[in-house]
Amino acid sequence: MIDGFNVRIYALCEVNDRLLVLHEPFMGKMVCKLPGGGLEFGEGPIDCLQRELKEELNLEICKYTPFYIQEHYVESLAKNNKQIVMLYFLVQLVEPEKINILDPQIASYRWISKDSDCPFDLPVDRIVFKKWQNLL
């Protein structure tokens, strides 16, 4: 039985029509994912975005736009009895060239173009990627 929520906030960091993706371990395998993480108590979604990008990659946001809200029920794969709620924001970075991996869990990063095959492993990330590809 579900007994709580895990709210996740993710950033679509776009520079020159390319999207920042991360590679990190998740449940025993390496996955491709977007930057972001869990909302902490007393924190708003934008505060979470700013904190996660600073903590993980030493990046700062200068502009953000809500992009996608998860539409269906998703149960957490990593946390027993928790429902995940995911919010995605399209963000502009202050100085994207200053990217520096600070989180030891992140193995690598890369920038992908809109015409790339979908690199994402997690189902909602795949939906978000397709929506991003269709932006003009």
Indicate where each model-derived feature is located:
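Active-site-adjacent beta-strand/loop module that shapes the phosphate/pyrophosphate-binding cleft
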Residues: 72-98
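Flexible, glycine-rich phosphate/dinucleotide-binding loops
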Residues: 20, 28, 73-75, 118
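A generic structural micro-feature
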Residues: 3-5, 31, 79-85, 103-106
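N-terminal strand-loop-strand
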Residues: 1-34, 93
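The catalytic Nudix box helix
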Residues: 34-68
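NUDIX/MutT-family hydrolases
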Residues: 90, 100-132
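Short connector loops at helix/strand junctions that flank enzyme active sites
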Residues: 6, 14, 34, 46, ...
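Hydrophobic pocket/interface hotspot
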Residues: 22, 49, 53, 109
